[in-house]
């Protein structure tokens, strides 16, 4: 998977220099807006605090899909506006409040600047708006959204104290805890903040295989990615894929593969087609596939196959947890992704090609692979 760098030879007259520079100029320019935009973050350090804060919020919005890129954050915000401006507003409010709370609590500044103190609250705001039985533009909802967003840095800090002992990320566990707590406290019959009624399946679904639509299945692939943010609009899902692609093509590939495997898992269990079309089988497996396929494990053929296995396992676990949690009137959220991926990250093996990235070194898959190759090279050369 490694390519040897090629050298550009210049003649004595220097006629080839401008041409060589032209070839390098475009990749260099792309380097400033792809990946984690590290150069931009460094440039912002001596700029006004308000401008830095906007960068942190945008990175927080994109960190839901493991991306720390403000341009990706803008694209994702556009996708949310395409889906529902009210959900976009609640997501932004949640991210802003959570980031401010983290600053007030003096949390690790590098985590704040990378957006790691905002992404859980992004989901909290969006999903609280989606599960509100009052519909769109129920402005009083902004108060509980702000309150629950304040809990996210607290949950994150507490969970990190435990999970850091095993060098594990907190993922979206704070979001799951905050949303489950809110929906449990309010419920469908709350007079102030009623939530959508979640009930278990009580009858055999009517699945007619001849009615299966290939076009709808194709659309469900981007919709599965869109459902990471609670969006069922294929255009929104396509924009999210574009935002991921801007940061990392490898992440985009695994996001799409994970969504596809979720569709396959749903079909294998004869799930209702409308659930598959709505992307409900794809979002957890998409996140799991990204996490194992190069993000928290260095990408090799072995970890790629492990990512596929994790995506399938996550989809089936999601079906199981949906049935169990519906009994108490709660959605499964991203609990399946968190539990399944943490389980796979705890895997121990003597295979050197299955390499779990140190949390402090995690950036994005392409950079993670470079770190892995350099570490492997140092290990081989060490005894010499």
Curated annotation (Swiss-Prot):
Main location group: membrane
Catalytic activity: urea(in) = urea(out)
Site positions for Important for channel permeability: 334
Pfam families named among the record's database cross-references: UT
Keyword Ribosomal protein: no
Database matches in InterPro entries: Ammonium/urea_transptr, Urea_transporter
GO biological-process terms attached to the record: urea transmembrane transport
Membrane association type: Multi-pass membrane protein
Gene Ontology terms for molecular function: urea channel activity; urea transmembrane transporter activity
Segments for region (Disordered): 1-23
Glycosylation site positions: 206
Keywords per UniProt: Cell membrane, Glycoprotein, Membrane, Transmembrane, Transmembrane helix, Transport
Role according to the record: Mediates the transport of urea driven by a concentration gradient across the cell membranes of erythrocytes and the renal inner medullary collecting duct which is critical to the urinary concentrating mechanism. Facilitates water transport in erythrocytes.
Assembly and oligomerization: Homotrimer; each subunit contains a pore through which urea permeates. Identified in a complex with STOM.
Name assigned to this protein: Urea transporter 1
């Amino acid at each position: 998977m490694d390519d040897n760098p090629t050298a550009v030879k210049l003649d004595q007259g220097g006629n080839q220099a401008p041409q060589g520079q032209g070839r390098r100029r475009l990749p260099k320019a792309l380097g400033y807006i792809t990946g984690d935009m590290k150069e931009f973050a460094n440039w912002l350090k001596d700029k006004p605090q308000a401008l830095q804060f906007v960068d942190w919020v945008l990175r927080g919005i994109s960190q839901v899909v493991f991306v720390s890129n403000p341009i990706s954050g803008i694209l994702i915000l556009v996708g949310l506006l395409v889906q529902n401006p009210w959900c976009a507003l609640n997501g932004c409010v949640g991210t802003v409040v959570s980031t401010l709370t983290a600053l007030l609590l003096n949390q690790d500044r590098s985590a704040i600047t990378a957006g790691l103190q905002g992404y859980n609250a992004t989901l909290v705001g969006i999903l609280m708006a989606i599960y509100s039985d009052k519909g769109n533009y129920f402005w009083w909802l902004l108060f509980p959204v702000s309150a629950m967003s304040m809990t996210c840095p607290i949950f994150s800090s507490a969970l990190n104290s435990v999970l850091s002992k095993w060098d594990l990320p907190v993922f979206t566990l704070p979001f799951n805890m905050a949303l489950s707590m809110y929906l449990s406290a309010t419920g469908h019959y709350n007079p102030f903040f009623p939530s959508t009624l979640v009930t278990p399946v009580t009858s055999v679904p009517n699945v007619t295989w001849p009615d299966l639509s290939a076009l709808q299945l194709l659309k469900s692939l981007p919709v599965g990615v869109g459902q990471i943010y609670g969006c069922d609009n294929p255009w929104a899902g396509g924009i999210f894929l574009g935002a991921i692609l801007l940061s990392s093509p490898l992440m985009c590939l695994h996001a799409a593969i994970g969504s596809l495997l979720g569709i396959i898992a749903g079909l294998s269990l004869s799930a209702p087609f409308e659930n598959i079309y709505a992307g409900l089988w794809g979002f957890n497996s998409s996140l799991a596939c990204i996490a194992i396929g190069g993000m928290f494990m260095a990408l090799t053929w072995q970890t790629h196959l492990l990512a596929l296995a994790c995506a399938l396992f996550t989809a089936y676990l999601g079906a199981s947890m949906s049935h169990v949690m519906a009994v108490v009137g709660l959605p499964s959220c991203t609990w399946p992704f968190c539990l399944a991926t943490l389980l796979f990250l705890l895997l121990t093996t003597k295979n050197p090609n299955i390499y779990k990235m140190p949390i402090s070194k995690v950036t994005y898959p392409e950079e993670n692979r470079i770190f892995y190759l350099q570490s492997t090279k140092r290990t081989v050369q060490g005894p010499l």
